[in-house]
């Protein structure tokens, strides 16, 4: 039975010897438990106020990300990505036990690949700002993890080590296994400290036999009486016995199995049978409190590992040659217990290749073979727990239920969310995985999920995505798995955590007040979230790839909090009361669930409007939930999505004065110059800057006005760098607000002075953008007039790029190419400037004209008779015979032509209707655009006059800068993960080939 305390404390309080830890950090990486202990007690250490300069190997630093943002700038040259600019910094999560507790970002040196840097910080929200950085030069590629002996503290010539009594076995061994996966050239001996004399007892009253000293000390476990008991089908163990006996018959393996074989007949025996082969026989197992194991040989652990390593391949081949069939374990109540000495072999046989997500190394298998007990369950890095009994407090008489394994696996769990809930909160749980059945068979079953001993129905949202509601449950960890409504597990078993405490129902009026605009928006938003559509069965297999990708993006944003702005969550939390903060957390869970549901639905999905004409993105912007913008965009909502009145999310954020939300929207590409729908009161519409200015948010108004000017110019000059020599070199004259940075603060600077400096820079930037836009408009108008005067209406196609390039290069001096062209033209003109050359040219031209006239006259005279015959024929047939007319008989060739009367003069009574020209519409639109540009420039200039507006503008620049840095780091992490998936050989963090070679036993056993 799994000990509850092994899950209760993620990071047990370790008594670290800092001097020894610092000395060991010179040649090995620290383990997650040690790092967690340091980060949780960071106030006891010195936090560096500035980044180091080229730190040496073995250096350890603590930084505060809120204080020192650029702690990674250490002067070293790290390995770059393909672009040659961004540092290739990969990311992983480290576990303590079965729970992710640490972020780990690691980088490799460019010149020296063995020199590495690892940055760690906690996943807990209140400790995320403390960063632990470790520099180390790894000696060699891989070394096995072994026990480090200390001869100075040995007794009778042997080293005796034990684990701190306060450390939970699960945490200790999990960290040991993590080192085997993620460490480079390190030894698992930090939490193991030398002891002058061996431990002979423990707090549970169980005393190990003398022969068990080494095993118990290595694992640090304590066997106690189990509250649950299982009955194992003995016939299923015959196959295992056949393989073990064949292995036992080998001469070089006799000694190894003899060392492992206990002599007590009350435990599991290994019998040899020459006819039927060896089999494992389950006898009566006594209580662990009354049973002691008498080992025939007190073998040292190192000797056993060496012997097992030498004979591992033979053992694997013998087991792999058997035709093993899957078998299951079912729960029964009789008080019978199974000794755990051979439980690891049974677990290996129960796991099929489909459910085996990650193979463990040989060191894990050897440790489990030596002495895994029932209250110590090793867990894989994916967080799935073993098939074992999990204690439940709901049992009245101390009897617990164990998950029952079905005959075959029908579903593979990749991830699920959320992984915890309050005891009385029936939250929705999303399970992402893969069905191992055909679509017809998937719809045939009634799928359910088990939370401990409670089975709840599940709904299929899309192929591979299930949704269920967690039932009310007592606090604690329970097994979680998928069933076919028969209480038998058809997937891997995971762990769900029920947290103590009750869910508080918070009303929107308690947070935002009564009869306020925010309370009304919140209530309408909650009403929208409550709206769900039923997913039909014939739709769950449509567009599976796109839907799963969107769901994966949403869940990734939910798990990764790195997209949050630095300090944004803390600032909002300080502004709100505790009830408001709790309401925000509850609302966040509902929002993510709603987005996943809408992604799987048919129709508009999340692009829907409520009864009053607002959508989800508009509510998010109006309420200031900037943390929800990226998940909403990941669900497929456009950032410029309009409501019924033509308002975008940026309009709502500016109208409500949400600084962080405005900065996030502009950084993500929202159109700052978008207009609302025209109305009788506002025939020209309003921009977001106009709405912010009307509500007194002058800083936001100036920020958006500058953004509209610079972004409009950026759209016109999107490709001008390639064709314009003016912009091909040098710094950009006009920067967008997403590219700008706030003025850095130095010693002696006053905040008012810095905000004034930023505001003046904004005025200069906006003035240059407006001036260039006016030049572009004037140039386009002038070129059109020239073409209209020439009459070449087909060539009235002036590109914006040409006009912008000309406007940008007007102030520049002509280059060397213009001088050379002028010289060439002058040389050509000089050749024909003399009277002699000109006379020859005129004579030649006159002769050519005469020749052309003779040729044309000859052609006309040659065709004259044919033309006369044709005209006569047509005159007789059509004009005379067909139309019964006179034909050409009365035609007079020398008759005077009839004079055309002149048109009457244009008067006010009868004006002439002007000819329609589509350019008139463009002129009117351009006139309105110029008025808006002038108004935007006025908004930016007026911002300088108010200190509050200048401070608000500086805060917006700071948020935009922080958002840009977080986006760069997160995109680099995602790209690194993609590159590592394609190029596994470049990843020095985990050696996949060595793990596969070590786990031949596990891979060879198939059901």
From Swiss-Prot:
Residues 915-943 form a coiled coil. One of its GO terms (cellular component) is nucleus. GO terms for molecular function: calmodulin binding; DNA binding. The two IQ domains are probably not interacting with calcium/calmodulin. Residues 148-227 are annotated as: Disordered. Its main location: nucleus. It is found in: Nucleus. Expressed in roots, stems, leaves, pollen and siliques. Belongs to the CAMTA family. Residues 148-164, 183-202 have a biased composition (Polar residues). The keyword Disulfide bond does not apply. Residues 18-144 bind DNA. Disruption phenotype: No visible phenotype under normal growth conditions, but mutant seedling are hyper-responsive to auxin in hypocotyl growth inhibition. No visible phenotype under normal growth conditions, but mutant seedling exhibit reduced drought tolerance. No visible phenotype under normal growth conditions, but the double mutants camta1 and camta3 are impaired in freezing tolerance. No visible phenotype under normal growth conditions, but the double mutants camt1 and camt3 exhibit semi-dwarf phenotypes. This is Calmodulin-binding transcription activator 1. The keyword Protein transport does not apply. The lineage of its organism: Eukaryota, Viridiplantae, Streptophyta, Embryophyta, Tracheophyta. Induction: Induced by UVB, wounding, ethylene and methyl jasmonate. Induced by salt stress and heat shock. Induced by aluminum. Residues 165-176 have a biased composition (Low complexity). Transcription activator that binds calmodulin in a calcium-dependent manner in vitro. Binds to the DNA consensus sequence 5'-[ACG]CGCG[GTC]-3'. Regulates transcriptional activity in response to calcium signals. Involved in freezing tolerance. Involved in freezing tolerance in association with CAMTA2 and CAMTA3. Contributes together with CAMTA2 and CAMTA3 to the positive regulation of the cold-induced expression of DREB1A/CBF3, DREB1B/CBF1 and DREB1C/CBF2. Involved in drought stress responses by regulating several drought-responsive genes. InterPro entries: Ankyrin_rpt, Ankyrin_rpt-contain_sf, CG-1_dom, Ig-like_fold, Ig_E-set, IPT_dom, IQ_motif_EF-hand-BS, P-loop_NTPase.
